């Protein structure tokens, strides 16, 4: 079993997300979104949690500061990129956030790649509401990080079965590999917990699992780990669950 560092990343990458908030109405504010995007990128790259204070409403500021501070403990050397993205089908403005860098955990150094997409609503240049639309991350340790592909769908239907795969692009042959998968709860994400992930022997080609979507619309957040002779690969992804009706 191993502690899963990636869950801290998931919850911190979702620092602009509060499950109690969702964007209600589209707003025409293209230039305002571009300005906010630039300011957010500057604030995230400043390394100061207080830099977000001018970007968010008073209600959101404490949550943002706490989550960013925790994130910086585990991932102190990262670079953020924030860009406006295409509006949602109902006209809501969106942002794409990407982060790259390195992290250390349990004596291993990880290369980090992660991204998320959020729908937002601004009021006088401040973030007041948001909705997480997509999220995924990849952490790889070792002098030569293992080339892998995260094959998990973005959207699935309620009640359907679907595959959660972490594919090794250059199979390891007879090498001993162990892997595991867990469904992260909202409570684990909000608390920025590091759950213990049980591992089992896997083939050299990666980890391949079939999972069940819930019967109600919403989302599922998956955490996957693969331990190989040269290091560790961890990945996360949020899957939207939509009604089949």
Per-region residue spans from a language model:
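Short beta-strand edge/turn micro-motifs at domain boundaries
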Residues: 110-147
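Bacterial N-terminal signal peptides
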Residues: 8-17
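Short acidic/polar inter-strand loop motif in beta-rich domains
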Residues: 104, 226-236
């Amino acid at each position: 079993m191993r502690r899963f560092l990636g869950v801290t990343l998931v919850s911190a990458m979702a620092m602009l997300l509060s499950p109690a908030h969702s964007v209600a109405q589209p707003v025409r504010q293209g230039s305002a979104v571009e300005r906010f995007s630039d300011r957010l990128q500057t604030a995230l790259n400043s390394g100061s949690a207080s830099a977000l204070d001018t970007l968010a409403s008073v209600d959101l500021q404490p949550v943002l500061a706490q989550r960013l501070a925790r994130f910086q403990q585990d991932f102190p050397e990262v670079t953020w990129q924030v860009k406006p993205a295409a509006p949602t089908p109902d006209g809501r403005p969106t942002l794409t956030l990407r982060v790259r860098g390195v992290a250390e955990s349990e004596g291993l150094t990880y290369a980090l790649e992660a991204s998320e997409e959020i729908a937002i609503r601004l009021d006088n240049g401040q973030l007041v509401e948001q909705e997480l639309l997509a999220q995924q991350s990849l952490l790889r340790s070792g002098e030569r990080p293992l080339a892998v592909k995260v094959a998990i769908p973005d959207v699935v239907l309620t009640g359907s079965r679907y595959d959660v795969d972490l594919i090794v692009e250059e199979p390891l042959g007879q090498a001993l590999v162990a892997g595991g998968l867990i469904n992260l709860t909202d409570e684990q994400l909000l608390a920025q917990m590091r759950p213990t992930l049980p591992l089992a022997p896997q083939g050299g080609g990666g980890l391949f699992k079939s999972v069940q979507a819930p019967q109600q619309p919403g989302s599922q957040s998956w955490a996957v780990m693969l331990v190989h002779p040269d290091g560790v690969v961890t990945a996360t992804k949020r899957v939207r669950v939509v009604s089949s009706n």
